[in-house]
Amino acid sequence: MTPDDARAVASYRSRSVSRTWRPEELVLRVVSKAMRVPASTVLSGNRRHDISLARHVWWYVCATTFPGGRAETMRRCRVEKRTLGYALARIEDRRDDPAFDDLLSAIELDMPKDTSDKPGH
């Protein structure tokens, strides 16, 4: 991970936000900042390599962070089962690259421990 990537991920730790974010929105914001792809572009469905990679990382982090795993990710991110399965496999394969694994680990560390949006959790 380059120093710029680390700064991008760490920048969210020092910000305060005035609205309540849904868990998938929070993950999207952190991933889009770390990967330097605007959140609106990640959501656009564009198939360009860097954009689809950011989208797949978003889904991967959601699937590994949310208590409901894949099913919860499919519901929250509005993604089909096969598409999600492909994305998760793609990201797992990319984790063999130390630089990519460092970036993904930094993103995962930046996620709150409790991503439930239910009261009392």
Features from the language model and the residues they span:
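General nucleic-acid-binding
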Residues: 1-29
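Helix-turn-helix DNA-binding elements, focusing on the entry/boundary residues of the two helices
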Residues: 28, 69-70
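Short, Lys/Arg-enriched anionic-surface-contact patches
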Residues: 33-55
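Short, amphipathic alpha-helical "recognition" segments used to contact nucleic acids or chromatin
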Residues: 52-67
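DNA major-groove recognition helix of helix-turn-helix
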Residues: 63, 88, 92-95
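Short alpha-helical "recognition helix" segments of helix-turn-helix
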Residues: 71-80
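Helix-turn-helix DNA-binding helix
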Residues: 83-85
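Short Lys/Arg-enriched helix C-cap and helix-to-coil transition segments
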Residues: 95-120
